[in-house]
C-alpha cells in the first residue's frame, strides 16, 4: 500500500508580542528556586518568577530574551510568561518590536 502524499506547508507560528502590562526582558542572573534577575526594556531591573506550569517545559538560562508581566502591587517583581527562541528574537527585530542594539546591550 502506497503512502499518502501530504502537501503540508510548514506552519509559521505567531511570535507573541508584548501586550499592555507586559515587557520584553533579558535574563541577567539565575537566582535559584525558579527565580531570575531580569533587565527589562523599560530600564528597570526586576526579580522574575518562573511559574510552576512553565518551569519543566521551558528552561531559562542567562542571556535569554523573555516576555514578562510586572506585578501591579510590587512593580519590582514580575512573572515570566514566555521565552523567545533565537529565531523569534530575529523576527521581533525584523518587525521592529525591539532593536538588535538594545538586546545586545542588555545581554552585556
UniProtKB/Swiss-Prot annotation:
Keyword Glycoprotein found: no
Pfam (any one): eIF-1a
SMART domains: eIF1a
Keywords for the protein's UniProt record, in alphabetical order: Initiation factor, Protein biosynthesis
Molecular-function GO terms, alphabetical: RNA binding; translation initiation factor activity
Job of this protein: Seems to be required for maximal rate of protein biosynthesis. Enhances ribosome dissociation into subunits and stabilizes the binding of the initiator Met-tRNA(I) to 40 S ribosomal subunits.
Record has Plastid as a keyword: no
NCBIfam families in the cross-refs: eIF-1A, PRK04012.1-1, PRK04012.1-3, PRK04012.1-5
Residue stretches making up the S1-like domain: 11-85
Protein's name in the database: Translation initiation factor 1A
Organism from which the protein derives: Sulfurisphaera tokodaii (strain DSM 16993 / JCM 10545 / NBRC 100140 / 7)
Membership in a protein family: Belongs to the eIF-1A family.
Amino acid at each position: 500500500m502506497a503512502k499518502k502524499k501530504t502537501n503540508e506547508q510548514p506552519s509559521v507560528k505567531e511570535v507573541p508580542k508584548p501586550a499592555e502590562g507586559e515587557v520584553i526582558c533579558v535574563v541577567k542572573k539565575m537566582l535559584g528556586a525558579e527565580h531570575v534577575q531580569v533587565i527589562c526594556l523599560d530600564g528597570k531591573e526586576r526579580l522574575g518568577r518562573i511559574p510552576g506550569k512553565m518551569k519543566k517545559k521551558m528552561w531559562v538560562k542567562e542571556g535569554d530574551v523573555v516576555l514578562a508581566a510586572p506585578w501591579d502591587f510590587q512593580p519590582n517583581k514580575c512573572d515570566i510568561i514566555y521565552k523567545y527562541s533565537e529565531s523569534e528574537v530575529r523576527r521581533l527585530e525584523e518587525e521592529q518590536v525591539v532593536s538588535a542594539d538594545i538586546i545586545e546591550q542588555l545581554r552585556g
